[in-house]
Amino acid sequence: MKLSNKGSDSVFLQEEIFTNLKKAKEIHLVSCDIRHGEDTIQNGVALQLIRNGAESSDTTFAVEKKKVIGLAQKQETYFIDREIIQDALNAHEGYLRAIESYSSLNTLIQTPFEYVLHYILNCRNYKSDALSDINTVKGNVAHRYIEWLTHKNGRSVKEMQQMHQDDFDVNVNHIIESHGILLLQENNQLDMMLFKSQLKKSVTVLLNIIDTNQLTIVGSEYQAETDIDGIGRMYAQVDLLLQKDEKLIVFDFKWNEGSTYQKKLENNLSLQLAVYKNILEKACNQDVVFCGYYILPKHKLLTHDHGILSDKNIENVNPANNNDLFQQAIHSYDYRKKQLLNGVVEEAETLPLANLQYTIDSISENLYPLDTHYSNPNCKATLYGEPNKVLKGQLL
């Protein structure tokens, strides 16, 4: 099947993927043929489909494509016939989903190809959280421990503090056994000891911030949903929702060194917090007066919202601008949906931002900025982990 080349933007489409993935129950890489010529070209990925229902026999087909890797100006543009993915459109009329979240919204804005695969065609990676990379496992265990501690003590901060100090080792070990088995491997024993020490200190500081500021815990992993103009139904799950004087306060937990989120706040790019704030204010009919990232390994709370809470472990960050991130995201949602309905899916990781139509239109359309590559701020970021690299014709 030939693809129609209609331009030179950084948009890349594979018709066979959208035609066949909807029929697939399981997908296996069979072969990957790489050719090297004047330009480096990847070509001829074969996938094996195990089909549902009556069509149960194995089928092998070739996904033929031609993608130049390297020089962005030679990147070809492909368009897909809307009829080819009619099954998906029937299930999600106009690519509309029943409900969106921060994760799906951000994926649509930053990596539309992954949005279509993950959220429309349900092509997902079902790897167990307990067997993820070590830092992801640490984050999962930390989240689970705080959630368990909150519910076990009826959201009472004093009781949480007492149990945390008296029974931390026993309780966190139970969480590790069920959600962090990777930490129990022999080669990770020193890592686990450091992790437990960091987590104990971090939760102690967290509970002290809550206690000294006289905050009430509304819920851990608190869920809310509401209708948002310009998007539709939206859902949020907040790591820790608190309240003071009838005003809401949001803590989002991160298990890393915090530089990423420090920069997000400095550059006013903390879309996750903006999404949570807008969903909660409408769903709960209360003002959200404080949102912050709590960096667990550093036991540091980063925020834009000065003067609401006080503690030596709270760091106030001044943003570079006062852009309304949520309104930008709504505009970007509409922009990306229109692209999808016109058969255009951007797959432009590592390419110069200045060459992308999205970037060109960003000022006039007031769009949310694209993430930049960690090694080159003038290029588009790659998706962490590249879960669909084979489908996009990249090497394993």
Please identify what each model-predicted range represents.
Residues M1, N43-G44, S101, E266:
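Generic structural signal for alpha-helix starts
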Residues L3-A54, N342-I360:
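C-terminal accessory regions
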Residues V30, G37, G70-L396:
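RecB-family 4Fe-4S metal-dependent nuclease core
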Residues I41-I84:
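Helicase C-terminal subdomain and adjacent C-terminal extension
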